[in-house]
Amino acid sequence: MAMTDPLGDMLTRIRNGQQAKKDSVLTPASTLRVRVLDVLQREGYIRGYSEEALGAKGQHKGIRIELKYFEGQPAIRHVARVSKPGRRVYSGSKELPIVRNGLGITIVSTPRGVLSDAEAREQNVGGEVLAEVF
């Protein structure tokens, strides 16, 4: 069966992995997923990620995401998909949502790449609001 929301699937794997206290989770690779992981790593929500070969012959690519914890608690307390395949959400740079009074981030896909809300405001660009994390 085809996956309708690959980014939502990755965010769910991260959420489930942290609830189960896993060190890392594995997800299929895609360019968008890598760009979102770059933002999460820059903002300090994950330790890092690496690309791996999957399958018996290594014909598929996967991403191993190294989860981060602080004093035994997950670094990501909440992660939610905002723009979904059935309902896209777009925002200008001035209207980007502020998550938890600035304690969290919004991940935005812009013409300049996938950025956090702070980076998008700084560069004065808007775009599709992909997810919110805190």
From Swiss-Prot:
Keywords, ordered alphabetically: Ribonucleoprotein, Ribosomal protein, RNA-binding, rRNA-binding
InterPro entries per record: Ribosomal_uS8 (IPR000630), Ribosomal_uS8_CS (IPR047863), Ribosomal_uS8_sf (IPR035987)
Gene Ontology MF, one: rRNA binding
One GO biological process term: translation
Pfam families per UniProt: Ribosomal_S8
GO cellular component annotations of the record: ribonucleoprotein complex; ribosome
Function: One of the primary rRNA binding proteins, it binds directly to 16S rRNA central domain where it helps coordinate assembly of the platform of the 30S subunit.
Subunit structure: Part of the 30S ribosomal subunit. Contacts proteins S5 and S12.
The family this protein is said to belong to: Belongs to the universal ribosomal protein uS8 family.
HAMAP family: Ribosomal_uS8_B (MF_01302_B)
Protein name: Small ribosomal subunit protein uS8
Gene source species: Sphingopyxis alaskensis (strain DSM 13593 / LMG 18877 / RB2256) (Sphingomonas alaskensis)
Lineage per the UniProt record: Bacteria, Pseudomonadati, Pseudomonadota, Alphaproteobacteria, Sphingomonadales
Name of encoding gene: rpsH
